[in-house]
Regions:
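Short, well-formed alpha-helical segments that are part of the catalytic scaffolds
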Residues: 17-33
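Short aromatic/hydrophobic "clamp" motif used to bind/position activated sugar donors
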Residues: 88
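The conserved acidic donor/metal-binding loop of glycosyltransferases
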Residues: 92-97
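Catalytic donor-sugar/metal-binding loop of nucleotide-sugar-dependent glycosyltransferases
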Residues: 151-152, 173-176, 186-203
């Protein structure tokens, strides 16, 4: 009897990313993941794009689901609900994250028997990949994470993580916007006591225009969100 392959789903929220979406999808190393015994599925969540993002994603071989109500966190939740049971990986649609490294991340995930793996972009920034404002904000949020939750996490804002879908039922995820990335790490690694690890990655300069128009405002909203969670959770 042929052993059934495990499933790994790469969930990619996308809003008007026609310049980068094909490059992002093609970076997923499906052949290498097949050799590791996984059926690799790319799931693009189109978050109300007004350009050709969804059509290009389908042509590039991705499954596409539509989430017309905009919000980074909302798009991710839609992707999680649509993904099959197994392992989920997240990444942005702007070609910043090293999707070619998924096999090595998966090996670390399996070898360490993890429930949740997150990544540290600050360990390998390409020139121009992150503004000084964003770097400062990330460091402030990392300090807040250590103080409030005793989690030694260098980059709590990273958008590339890997986790078992079956942990989602225990997580209280309230944000439908940018703070979801930080919130899911706190929920998994602190409140749910998942086995977790943070590993360094290379982070590239994005293709196309950023959707993050006011980094300080977004960072403040994130900080308030996690502080409130610490007080009322």
């Amino acid at each position: 009897m042929t052993e059934q392959k495990k499933v790994i789903t790469i969930v990619i929220p996308a809003l008007n990313e026609e310049r980068a979406i094909v490059k992002t999808i093609h970076a997923v190393p499906k052949a290498a993941l097949t050799e590791m015994g996984y059926d690799a599925q790319v799931l693009v969540v189109d978050n109300g794009s007004t350009d050709g993002t969804a059509e290009l994603a389908r042509e590039a071989g991705a499954n596409v689901v539509l989430e017309p109500n905009r919000g980074y966190g909302r798009a991710l939740k839609t992707g999680f609900a649509s993904a099959q049971d197994g392992v989920i990986v997240t990444a942005d649609a702007d070609a910043t994250y090293p999707l070619e490294d998924i096999p090595s991340l998966l090996a670390a995930f399996e070898d360490n028997n993890l429930d949740f793996l997150t990544t540290n972009r600050l360990a390998g920034l390409d020139d121009g990949a992150m503004t000084p404002v964003n770097m400062t904000g990330n460091r402030i949020l990392a300090i807040a994470t250590r103080v409030l939750f005793q989690l030694d996490m260098r980059d709590p804002e990273s958008g590339m993580w890997m986790f078992k879908k079956n942990i989602l039922g225990a997580l209280e995820l309230h944000s439908n916007s940018w703070p979801l990335s930080h919130e899911i790490k706190i929920e998994a690694c602190y409140y749910s006591q998942c086995r977790w690890k943070e590993v360094p990655i290379r982070y590239r300069r994005r293709v196309g225009e950023t959707k993050l128009l006011n980094a300080w405002k977004v960072g403040l909203i994130d900080l308030c969100h996690i502080a409130k969670k610490r007080l009322v959770r």
